[in-house]
């Protein structure tokens, strides 16, 4: 009997392939066309997206990408490739592919790469620690569309999320302790998660609870008093209410109250990207300092640290 050959698919959101208005427009069009991301009726959404949002946002967002672009490409792509390569180095007999929900490399190209390696079984690890319909759900949907076009369908193991996994919490705690050792222990550790519309949560998305689960476990691992840790939500888009409290408004409030030293961690981001390196490390830093705060440090994402790769090994081990 032939032994089953397993491959691993690391999935993330995606990124423009260049910091130009044209590339950003292509990326945003694909991203904002996904009903999992924006579920506004199409007759209302298409004219707004194509006639207003893409023409206005693409040049502005391209400038933001230019401020963080790395020699090897966008930070998300650079760190995601490093994660893929580091995991593959630890698993020499297991093919590891990288696929993005939007942009390149696509999820379909990742599936094709693994099937070309003659795998019988694919372990799908969406690198979103906290489940949301708009992220993990989008990977699930696209995977279904891809496999619906295949004659040969492999076995699939799909890891829904890992918000309170011990190896994940340990990796976050180690990263926070290293930052405390470098900058001193902050007056407040602010945990900023990507927001979603409040309506999604009201309709059953358990993302807010999964964020609370991560926060609870991390606070316990660090041994910090609860009053020294705050949980907020960032990157809201559009006019409808999103999860609160908002990160930028909270930092402004803390600065105005005279909070001296803030450190910000974004536990929901597996790799640094525009939302962490520009929005949190730069924009929100300015908000806090201009409001009267004294010291601000951003704690980097786990990226390709050994502890993060250890976590990926642990999560995928039962299915390999």
Swiss-Prot record:
InterPro entries: Ferrochelatase, Ferrochelatase_AS, Ferrochelatase_C, Ferrochelatase_N. It holds the Pfam family Ferrochelatase. Pathway: Porphyrin-containing compound metabolism; protoheme biosynthesis; protoheme from protoporphyrin-IX: step 1/1. It is found in: Cytoplasm. Keywords: Cytoplasm, Heme biosynthesis, Iron, Lyase, Metal-binding, Porphyrin biosynthesis. One of its GO terms (molecular function) is metal ion binding. PANTHER family: FERROCHELATASE (PTHR11108), FERROCHELATASE, MITOCHONDRIAL (PTHR11108:SF1). Belongs to the ferrochelatase family. This is Ferrochelatase. It comes from Salmonella newport (strain SL254). The gene is hemH.
């Amino acid at each position: 009997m032939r032994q089953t050959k397993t491959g691993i698919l690391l999935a993330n959101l995606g990124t423009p392939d260049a910091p130009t208005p044209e590339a950003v427009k292509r990326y945003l069009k694909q991203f904002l066309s996904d009903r999992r991301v924006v579920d506004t009726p199409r007759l209302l959404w298409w004219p707004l997206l194509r006639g207003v949002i893409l023409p206005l946002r693409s040049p502005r967002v391209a400038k933001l990408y230019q401020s963080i672009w790395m020699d090897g490409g966008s930070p998300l792509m650079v760190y995601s490739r490093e994660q893929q390569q580091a995991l593959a180095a630890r698993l020499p007999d297991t093919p590891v592919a990288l696929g993005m929900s939007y942009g390149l490399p696509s999820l379909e190209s990742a599936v094709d790469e693994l099937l070309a390696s003659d795998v019988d079984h694919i372990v799908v690890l969406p690198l979103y620690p906290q489940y949301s319909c708009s992220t993990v759900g989008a990977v699930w949907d696209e995977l279904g569309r891809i496999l619906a076009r295949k004659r040969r369908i492999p076995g699939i193991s799909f890891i829904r999320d890992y918000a309170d996994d011990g190896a994940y919490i340990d990796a976050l705690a180690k990263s926070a302790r290293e930052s405390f050792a470098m900058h001193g222990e902050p007056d407040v550790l602010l945990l900023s998660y990507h927001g979603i519309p409040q309506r999604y949560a009201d309709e059953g998305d358990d993302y807010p609870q999964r964020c609370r689960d991560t926060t609870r476990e991390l606070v316990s691992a660090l041994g910090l008093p609860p009053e020294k840790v705050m949980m907020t939500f960032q990157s809201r888009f559009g006019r409808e209410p999103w999860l609160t409290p908002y990160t930028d408004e909270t930092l402004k409030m803390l600065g105005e109250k005279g909070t001296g030293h803030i450190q910000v961690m974004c536990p929901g981001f597996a790799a640094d990207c525009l939302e962490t390196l520009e929005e949190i490390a730069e924009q929100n830093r300015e908000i806090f300092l201009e409001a009267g705060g004294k010291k601000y440090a951003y704690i980097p994402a786990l990226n390709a640290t050994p502890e993060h790769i250890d976590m990926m090994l642990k999560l995928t081990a039962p299915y390999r």
